[in-house]
């Protein structure tokens, strides 16, 4: 920027940050383009630190409000909004970079780098069978997991033994990321509060809803919202969970699906696919997403409500353990179609001959047996 086009100087700065004199001058070629043209190369933070924004929008040194451009006013308004946002100091989380989202891989690396030996002692990697059950499993059951993959399997089961620690910065970032991605919020929120009920937790503290799944339940939610291939699916299921009739607790349902994934892994239902891919964690993640997708389709197409949840989850677990390959194939097909913009979860898989959204040709038996509206009696916990 040349001296002929713009010049400004600051003669003296008081200790309180106010300026004794700010002088700005523009050449005639810039007067018609608005005041901000002269300062376009200066960050807004510098403008406010030196009082230049105030000088541009006040009657100082001959500057009249009438000559202030809309761009200057808009910049000032944006800065004032930013200046009024205060970090969450009550949540107990002190991140080095507040507000930064965390990826699934970064969260996983955290657990790979810390000592989990006390949690690992609690795991039971496989189901112990005896008698005829053991013989039947040996003859007709799935293959055993390859030796080289067992450490990765044990890590998954160990994470499921870990609880949520609100004082741990990584744990806090995982929660914040899930909240921001599902709600679209750009700002941090308290780790305890009623706003977590909006996401489908039972109460103000998400930690109380992780029984039987531990932190793995949160890692699965993180995977769902941070993977570009499954994020749209997560949004659609979350939207379905807020349906005025078919609403259900999104996060609580997700925790139950993580439990199903844990059981499928321990019962070696996923061993064949893990051996084929030579990986465990990606298979478990995909199995979780595929099971959630199937639940959402059943919920949508069969007009399920919270009263049906116990039966839906029971049938879902049986199907998932019996036909994991089928579920994974369905997920792959769905994601391929979504990437081409050819399908929507909320409109997918209507059976031929269906009489519309209220068709009852597909039902679970005993659906009306549940009388209570509570999550516990519905079989969600």
UniProtKB/Swiss-Prot annotation:
Principal subcellular localisation of the protein: other
Role noted for this protein: Acts as a GTPase-activating protein (GAP) for ARL2 with low specific activity.
Subcellular localization(s) per the UniProt record: Cell projection, Stereocilium; Cell projection, Kinocilium; Cytoplasm, Cytoskeleton
Tissue occurrence: Both isoform 1 and isoform 2 are widely expressed.
The ELMO domain, residue ranges: 170-324
Protein name: ELMO domain-containing protein 3
Organism the protein comes from: Mus musculus
Signal peptide: none
A Pfam family matched in the record: ELMO_CED12
GO cellular component: a single term: cytoskeleton
GO BP terms in the entry: auditory receptor cell development; cilium assembly; cytoskeleton organization; gene expression; protein localization; protein transport; sensory perception of sound; stereocilium maintenance
Organism lineage: Eukaryota, Metazoa, Chordata, Craniata, Vertebrata
UniProtKB keywords: Cell projection, Cilium, Cytoplasm, Cytoskeleton, GTPase activation
């Amino acid at each position: 920027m040349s001296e002929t086009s713009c010049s400004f100087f600051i003669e003296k700065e008081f200790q309180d940050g106010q300026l004794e004199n700010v002088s700005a001058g523009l050449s005639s070629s810039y007067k018609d383009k608005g005041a901000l043209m002269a300062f376009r190369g200066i960050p807004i933070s510098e403008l406010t630190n030196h009082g230049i924004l105030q000088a541009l929008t006040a009657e100082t040194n001959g500057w009249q409000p009438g000559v202030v451009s809309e761009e200057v006013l808009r910049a000032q308004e944006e800065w004032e909004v930013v200046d009024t946002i205060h970090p969450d100091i009550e949540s107990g989380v002190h991140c080095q970079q507040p507000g930064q989202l965390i990826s699934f891989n970064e969260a996983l690396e955290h657990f790979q780098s810390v000592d989990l030996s006390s949690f690992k002692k609690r795991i039971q990697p496989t189901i112990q069978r005896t008698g005829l059950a053991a013989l039947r499993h040996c003859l007709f059951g799935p293959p055993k997991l390859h030796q080289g993959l067992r450490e990765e399997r044990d890590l998954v089961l160990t994470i499921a033994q870990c609880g949520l620690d609100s004082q741990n910065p990584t744990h806090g970032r995982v929660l914040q990321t899930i909240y921001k991605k599902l709600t679209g919020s750009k700002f941090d929120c308290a780790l305890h509060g009623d706003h977590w009920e909006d996401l489908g937790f039972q109460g103000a503290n998400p930690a109380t809803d992780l029984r039987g799944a531990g932190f793995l339940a949160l890692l699965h939610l993180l995977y769902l919202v941070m993977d570009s291939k499954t994020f749209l699916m997560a949004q659609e299921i979350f939207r379905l969970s807020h349906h005025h009739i078919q609403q259900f607790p999104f996060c609580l349902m997700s925790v139950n699906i993580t439990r199903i994934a844990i059981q499928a892994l321990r019962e070696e239902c996923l061993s064949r696919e893990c051996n084929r891919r030579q990986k465990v964690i990606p298979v478990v993640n995909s199995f979780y997403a595929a099971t959630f997708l199937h639940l959402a389709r059943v919920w949508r197409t069969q007009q399920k409500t919270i009263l049906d949840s116990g039966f839906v989850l029971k049938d879902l677990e049986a199907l998932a353990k019996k036909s994991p390959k089928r579920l994974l194939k369905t997920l792959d097909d769905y994601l391929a179609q979504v990437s081409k913009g050819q399908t929507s979860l909320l409109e997918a898989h209507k059976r031929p001959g269906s009489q519309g959204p209220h068709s009852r040709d597909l039902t679970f038996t005993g659906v009306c047996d549940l009388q209570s509206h509570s999550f516990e009696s519905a079989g969600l916990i």
